[in-house]
């Protein structure tokens, strides 16, 4: 189901018209599954679809690649996110009233009638672009190492989920579900609730000219919320949480020069590195 962007022409078949409907960031916000479901539930469904065709041993790495790619697809629609925010804030428009005809079409999609080979190629190409945009999370020669049918079924589950939201809780839910719980328990790891992190950061009240290091950073909750806190000081009237909004050079420099995190878990390091790179845009 989509909010209509065009009407069919008199020469156009219904099937051609349906297939030609664009899915933009506006559509994603309207039909976001997180309006009615939790990400843990959705990720659990994705894991089941993955396990139906592929080995569960590589579920974390492969689903991590898909989430990484999905975040990239949302991030490169940053101009559209800014337009939506401005029109809703200053133009007093509702989301459905916003004209999205000039918006970018999202690419992390899989239509029901689309061949699995075509979906795999499209998502693989998007993944390659994401790696070039955000190097250091995955090896440059890494590929999607799952069945093509698995890619299609997992993309269908994730495509109507808006991962960039006002806080890290949404993405944290995804990775908490994916990270091997047995391994976490053996090493005494856990995910600190975000409201606890928010409280601690507000109590410490870090300033943009201070440096911080977390020597057991895990998925980088404390470093990320320190970043958000300092960004809010640098630009108090700007959206400063986990959004697709563009960052100023000063904000990016603060992340690169002042915030550091360490951890002995390879999985946690990769998750934390990705969140820092994505939220700080490099």
Regions found by a protein language model. Give the residues of each.
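Short, basic/polar, glycine-containing "phosphate-handling" surface segments that engage DNA
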Residues: 1-58, 149-165
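Active-site-adjacent bridging/hinge elements
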Residues: 33-44, 171-177, 246-247
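Short, polar/flexible loop-turn hinges at active-site or ligand-entry regions and domain interfaces
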Residues: 50-55, 77-82, 185
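Conserved phosphate/pyrophosphate-binding and hydrolysis machinery centered on Walker-type P-loop NTPases
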Residues: 53, 57, 144, 164, ...
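Residue-level detector of well-ordered alpha-helical segments, enriched
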Residues: 58-63, 67, 150, 170, ...
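Short, hydrophobic/amphipathic alpha-helical patches that form generic packing surfaces
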Residues: 61-74, 274-278
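Long recognition/docking surfaces used for binding and targeting
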Residues: 68-180
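Conserved S-adenosyl-L-methionine
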Residues: 186-282
């Amino acid at each position: 189901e989509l909010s209509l962007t065009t009407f069919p022409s008199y020469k156009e078949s219904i099937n051609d018209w349906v297939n030609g409907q664009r899915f933009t960031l506006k559509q994603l916000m309207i039909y976001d599954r997180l309006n009615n479901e939790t990400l843990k539930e959705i990720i659990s469904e994705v894991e089941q679809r993955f396990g139906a065709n592929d080995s569960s041993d590589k579920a974390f790495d492969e689903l991590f690649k898909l989430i990484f790619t999905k975040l990239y697809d949302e991030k490169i629609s940053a101009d559209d996110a800014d337009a939506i925010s401005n029109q809703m804030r200053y133009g007093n428009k509702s989301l459905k009233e916003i004209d999205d005809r000039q918006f970018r079409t999202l690419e992390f999609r899989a239509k029901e009638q689309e061949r699995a080979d075509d979906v795999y190629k499209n998502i693989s190409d998007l993944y390659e672009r994401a790696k070039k945009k955000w190097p250091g999370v995955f090896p440059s020669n890494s590929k999607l190492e799952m069945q093509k049918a698995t890619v299609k079924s997992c993309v269908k589950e994730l495509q109507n989920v808006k991962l960039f939201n006002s806080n890290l809780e949404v993405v944290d839910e995804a990775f908490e579900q994916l990270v091997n719980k047995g391994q976490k328990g053996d090493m005494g790891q856990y995910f600190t609730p975000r409201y606890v992190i928010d409280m601690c950061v507000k109590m410490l009240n870090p300033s943009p000219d201070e440096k911080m290091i977390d020597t057991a950073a895990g998925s980088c909750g404390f470093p990320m919320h320190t970043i958000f806190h300092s960004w809010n000081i640098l630009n108090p009237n700007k959206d400063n949480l986990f959004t697709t909004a563009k960052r100023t050079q000063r904000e990016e420099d603060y992340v690169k020069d002042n915030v550091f995190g360490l951890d002995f878990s390879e999985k946690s390091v990769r998750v934390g590195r990705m969140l820092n790179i994505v939220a700080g845009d490099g």
